[in-house]
Amino acid sequence: MSITTAAPRTDDGTARRIPLSYNQQFLRAFDKGETDGAFGHRHTLVCGWRVTGAVDTDALQCALDDVVERHEVLRTAVVGDDEGGHQVVHPPAPVALEVTDLPDADGTPRDVRAEEFLNDLDAAPYPVRELPHLRAFLGRFDTTDAVLVLATHHTSTDAWSLQVLMRDLVAAYRARAAGGTAEQGEAVQYREFARYQQENADSGRIDRARAYWRERLAGAEITGITSDRPAQADLPSAYGVHRFVFDAELSRKVVEFARAERCTPFMVLAAAYSVLLRRRTGTTDVVFPTFSSGRYEERFADSVGPFFNFVPIRIDTGDCTTLADVLDRSRAACVGAYRNEIPFARIAEDSPALLAPFADGFLAVVAFEVLQSAFPLDGEGGGEPAGPRFAEIRRRTLSQRVSSAIPDGGLWAMDVLPGGELAGSLKFDHNRFDERTARELVEQFRHLLTALSGAPQTPLAKL
């Protein structure tokens, strides 16, 4: 979604005003122009799929265009004005599809080269003003082995949305390759979600949740990590990614420990992360943001848009003596947070001090999330489809000096892979952090996770 000061016009000369969602309003607070911040050309989501089987590029082009026609948010602009902004839906336009040959040359394994191809595209800029907010790249090793990469702007999609897009794209591709069009029900559009939020802004459920958060976050600030260098207002961000995969034994222990403790893996990982923040900052009362899918009602499960929601997790470890105690606090904090989830913008209205670290040039807020794969495709376990098979490239091990960006701070993401491994990434601004610091944080986290899953009665004082 592009942000502009003048309402763009549709082909018939009209511009229908659609209200912004709370998340779109929140993103506007991090608007730093077209090259940085929430609407910058690197605030993007780029994902890749390994493709096995012959690809009909004409059918792929038609399928991409079908997806843009189906999901309005991919052709929507955010308009800034004195009334707080609005969004405008544009007519469908062709998706840019770039086809590249990836011939075998230096003996590098194809899996590695596929990841390199994905990383190169992840590092590229995609201006938010260019519609539609979807670009596709097909890298071909040969006629039956390829990599498909989809790039979107993060103000128009989220991680869940990309799974929906890919599912719909595969359905449209198979129909087009067979000479027809996909028979899919009408999509629920993101603008309907924005209206739903406005219509339910003062409901009883919202009021009860706001009361919960006011009490839960009383006196709290999001915990920031001291950066190696202070932020400089005139220096644009320079994000990179440190990637890692924990060994199979540790990954197995974490998953089994979570099951034994009647927790989700996220609760275990969040407990370890809270202890990491405690050790790095010296505070025992930590608050860190995570992300949810933001889809409060089932009817939005198949919708595309920036639904993702900032959810603050407060874990007070002040009177905890062991790692097991911290896990108990983590479980309770997570359950309470998700039971009372509302748009973060509403939480921030009632707890403005929560965001203070974002204005502190010496602190960086590092959000922590566990990725969700909502719609696994054939390559990850589904029947014998007609045509090529698609498997998402989730096990990524190659770090990037230059990557897609986030509006501010850092982002720590974990993923429980289909084979049980724990993979992760830490996205950080090179202007504020050294890569050595990122590696140290990951190693400290690994140490804490090992202790928590293997010896939960370990006293915190002995870590």
Regions found by a protein language model. Give the residues of each.
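His-Asp-centered acyl/peptidyl-transfer active-site segments
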Residues: 11-16, 35-44, 61, 72-73, ...
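Acyl activation and transfer enzymes in specialized metabolism, enriched
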Residues: 51-75, 150-167, 240-282, 301, ...
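Acyl/amide activation-and-transfer machinery of modular secondary-metabolite enzymes
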Residues: 24-51, 81-106, 130-135, 145-147, ...
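Flexible, non-catalytic linker and terminal segments flanking ANL/adenylate-forming cores
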Residues: 1-27, 373-382, 423, 432-463
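Extended, hydrophobic beta-loop-alpha segments that form or line the acyl/peptidyl-thioester binding
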Residues: 71, 75, 166, 284-291, ...
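Active-site-proximal acidic secondary-structure segment that organizes catalysis
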Residues: 17-19, 132-192, 438-451
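Short amphipathic alpha-helices and their capping loops
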Residues: 1-36, 61-109, 117, 132, ...
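A short, small/polar-residue-rich loop/turn motif at beta-strand boundaries
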Residues: 2-15, 52-69, 88-130, 249, ...
